[in-house]
A protein has these predicted regions:
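A short, conserved, highly charged catalytic patch centered on acidic carboxylates
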Residues: 1-145, 152-214
Length: 214
């Protein structure tokens, strides 16, 4: 039965309830904007499906759990970080020899519109899997910034070199540069002082393990 989960609406709750995705990282306003644009359609078997007009692709997309998170993160990029839709690409092709994979969200460089600047991963609900995926994408494209989120937890990375991803506190807003937000390597004291564990919903155990894995 539906019990309001945070700021989730019934429609979004129903889509996410059997998944590993949550909406804690997103504002009430963003969730309300997404919900206002949801259209229900009935399939041949009478089952109802939710669709929404994609903020970037400008066409109707079925709202599966990972698509809910993607649309909410796009809203965040537009309304909180100030990135124009013109700099965003979805399902961006990343080449590994003959193999082609698709990055969920890519923000292109402001001055070089063909160069990836930020890559966002929402389809891997676990941090370790998402980070590995992002490492491969950034190494292939040269993108310096990566973000992983499942809607409950979020992590930001700066690709220092192919073998080292440094945690950063956030990604730059459209008006900022990477150097404006880049920080020294995290310490446990940093984490406590900045309350990052609570904000990002990542456990101390996971964060320490992540630091040790680098």
């Amino acid at each position: 039965s539906y019990e309001k989960a945070g700021d989730q609406t019934r429609e979004i709750y129903d889509i996410l309830k059997d998944s590993s995705y949550k909406t804690e990282q997103f504002s009430k306003e963003a969730i309300e904007r997404l919900n206002a644009n949801i259209v229900e359609k009935e399939g041949k078997n009478g089952k109802k499906f939710c669709f929404v007009k994609c903020l970037v692709r400008q066409k109707e997309i079925q709202l599966k759990p990972e698509e809910v998170i993607r649309q909410l993160f796009l809203d965040k990029l537009i309304n909180e970080y100030g990135y124009p839709i013109s700099r965003m690409q979805l399902e961006y092709p990343v080449y590994f020899g003959r193999e082609v994979k698709r990055a969920d969200i890519v923000i292109m460089d402001e001055d070089r519109s063909f160069v990836p600047y930020v890559i966002v991963e929402v389809k891997k609900p676990k941090l370790k899997d998402g980070k590995e995926q992002l490492k491969s994408y950034c190494n292939s494209t040269g993108a310096p910034i990566a973000v992983w989120t499942n809607g409950e937890q979020i992590a930001y990375f700066n690709r220092k070199d192919p073998n080292y991803f440094e945690d950063i506190r956030d990604i730059p807003k459209a008006s900022q540069t990477l150097m404006d937000v880049i920080s020294e390597r995290w310490t446990i004291e940093d984490l406590k002082a900045n309350d990052v564990l609570q904000k990002d919903k990542i456990s101390l155990k996971d964060k320490i393990k992540d630091l040790e894995d680098e």
